[in-house]
């Protein structure tokens, strides 16, 4: 799913939300998540998963063209860890709704 598909699905799921507002909501959410990660914070969305940073230590690499050794500096990379509900849903239970998707009278 692309960002534009997510915006379209959000707008179709909530008829009172016009496409422009859905796009703004998605962009705002992604910007907030990017800002939090860039500041070193962890993001946890219950039932979905968590985003964090993993540290990649400095290492010696090789230039593929010349074969010479190159020092690759340490860096931090974004990492996603899926939550239990998402893992279960993806693992063969793709047709089952998440707990929050069920109608209240069905419980």
Swiss-Prot record:
Translocase in keyword set: no
GO molecular function, one term: DNA binding
InterPro entries linked: Hist_DNA-bd, IHF-like_DNA-bd_dom_sf, IHF_beta
Pfam families with a match to the protein in the record: Bac_DNA_binding (PF00216)
GO CC terms in record: chromosome; cytosol
Keyword annotations of the record: DNA recombination, DNA-binding, Transcription, Transcription regulation, Translation regulation
Chain segments carrying region Disordered: 55-107
GO biological process, any: regulation of translation
Ranges annotated as biased composition (Basic and acidic residues): 65-101
Keyword presence, Ligase: no
UniProt record similarity statement: Belongs to the bacterial histone-like protein family.
Record text on subunit structure and interactions: Heterodimer of an alpha and a beta chain.
Role, per record: This protein is one of the two subunits of integration host factor, a specific DNA-binding protein that functions in genetic recombination as well as in transcriptional and translational control.
NCBIfam families reported for this sequence: hip, PRK00199.1
HAMAP family: IHF_beta
Protein name: Integration host factor subunit beta
Species per Swiss-Prot/TrEMBL record: Burkholderia mallei (strain ATCC 23344)
Organism phylogeny: Bacteria, Pseudomonadati, Pseudomonadota, Betaproteobacteria, Burkholderiales
